[in-house]
Amino acid sequence: MLKMNLQFFAHKKGVGSTKNGRDSESKRLGAKRADGQFVLAGNILYRQRGTKIHPGVNVGRGGDDTLFALVDGVLKFERKGRDKKQASVYPVEAK
């Protein structure tokens, strides 16, 4: 009597799952205008979460802590005390 021992193997390898492979979109935070740059009223100066930079003279703070210019002028990033920074906009005189 003839006995055959047949073994069948998968023709596709089993594929495992992974819990990696996704990331959130960057929020494009940070300085939008440079120190000493001329800015117009309404220009966004700094996008941030929390108050890393505080609003100074002629600078407003939006609901998401974004800093924006209230008047036309020159932007200056300054120290505020020992451990804080602020952004101010100083109007330039007409010549």
Curated annotation (Swiss-Prot):
GO terms for biological process: translation. It comes from Lachnoclostridium phytofermentans (strain ATCC 700394 / DSM 18823 / ISDg) (Clostridium phytofermentans). This is Large ribosomal subunit protein bL27. One of its GO terms (cellular component) is cytosolic large ribosomal subunit. InterPro entries: Ribosomal_bL27, Ribosomal_bL27_CS. The N-terminus is cleaved by ribosomal processing cysteine protease Prp. GO terms for molecular function: structural constituent of ribosome. The keyword Ribonucleoprotein applies. Keywords: Ribonucleoprotein, Ribosomal protein. It comes from the Bacteria. The lineage of its organism: Bacteria, Bacillati, Bacillota, Clostridia, Lachnospirales. Pfam families: Ribosomal_L27.
